[in-house]
């Protein structure tokens, strides 16, 4: 419990630093890249607290991203905000029961940018992520739902490559986010939410997490291409979230195909551009 409280304190401190860095970045550049993606795909959910069976089905997802350069390390660090909202409808293997799931995930990463060449950029740095959601199994009467609440510190890396096909500018991006240390809420094995919140008989419900008990990885692959003055973006997301705490196992595996658009904006003038000056572009 002391370790978990320590991690919570570190996360709170880092969050304050990140908010300061975001404010500081306003003075570095007015250029910002924003994108909005929507998509659908496959979901595999398993919650041993609710059922011994996996549930598989469809998922819908919304992603909003914002990136801009900061003044950190002589202006070579970019800040990235990522917001994921997804909902799933799944069945067990015999299709005799359904489960509903919903997650809200937010992350902020600071990437140091290495310009390998004029076309290739390597970015790496720390990341903070917060995740909230619920999985509902309509057949269970005593414990019909499992709350999802976890977050922590991790590492984030990105590769961006720009090229042309028939004089059409294209940008491909691969990103991987790896949680390293954090905290997670979980009931104990056989413990109900009534015992935790009504009877106040909760046990160890806030736990320390690491690669050992929460081995997770989120990967995103996108391709940008212009259509007139609009930058279209298509992508594929592989989101592997899993944990084993309090003798309870859980996982949510998502594979989604995304489509949307990206915008390069000069904030104070409201000017949208297909490209940015190379010295201030975060992407």
Task: Show which residues each predicted segment covers.
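Residues on the lipid-exposed face of transmembrane beta-strands in outer-membrane beta-barrel proteins
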Residues: 62-70, 104-112, 126, 155-161, ...
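Transmembrane beta-strands of outer-membrane beta-barrel pores
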Residues: 40-46, 85-91, 128-136, 176-184, ...
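Short glycine/proline- and aromatic-enriched beta-strand/turn motifs that initiate or cap beta-hairpins
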Residues: 22-80, 281-283
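Predominantly the C-terminal beta-signal and adjacent terminal strand-loop region
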Residues: 169, 175, 185-187, 207, ...
């Amino acid at each position: 419990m002391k370790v978990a409280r320590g991690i919570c304190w570190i996360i709170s401190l880092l969050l304050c630093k990140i908010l300061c860095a975001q404010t500081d970045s306003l003075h570095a550049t007015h250029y910002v890249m924003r994108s909005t993606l929507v998509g659908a795909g496959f979901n595999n959910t398993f919650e041993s607290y609710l059922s011994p069976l996996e549930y598989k089905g469809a998922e819908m997802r919304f992603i909003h991203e914002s990136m801009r350069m900061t003044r950190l390390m002589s202006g070579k660090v970019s800040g990235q905000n990522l917001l994921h909202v997804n909902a799933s409808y799944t069945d067990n293997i015999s299709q005799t029961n359904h489960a509903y799931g919903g997650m809200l995930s937010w992350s902020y990463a600071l990437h140091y940018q290495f310009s390998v060449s004029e076309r290739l950029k390597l970015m790496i740095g720390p990341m903070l992520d917060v995740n909230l959601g619920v999985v509902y199994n309509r057949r269970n009467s005593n414990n019909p739902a499992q709350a999802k609440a976890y977050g922590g510190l991790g590492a984030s890396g990105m590769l961006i490559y720009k090229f042309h096909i028939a004089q059409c500018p294209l940008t491909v991006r691969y990103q991987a986010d790896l949680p390293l240390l954090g905290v997670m809420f979980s009931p104990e094995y056989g413990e109900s939410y009534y015992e935790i919140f009504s009877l106040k008989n909760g046990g160890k419900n806030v736990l320390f997490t690491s690669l050992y008990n929460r081995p997770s990885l989120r990967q995103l692959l996108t391709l940008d291409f212009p259509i007139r003055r609009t930058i279209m973006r298509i992508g594929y997301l592989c989101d592997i979230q899993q944990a084993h705490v309090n003798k309870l196992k859980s996982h949510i595996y998502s594979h989604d195909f995304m489509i949307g658009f990206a915008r390069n904006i000069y904030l104070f003038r409201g000017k949208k551009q297909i490209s940015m000056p190379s010295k201030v572009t975060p992407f």
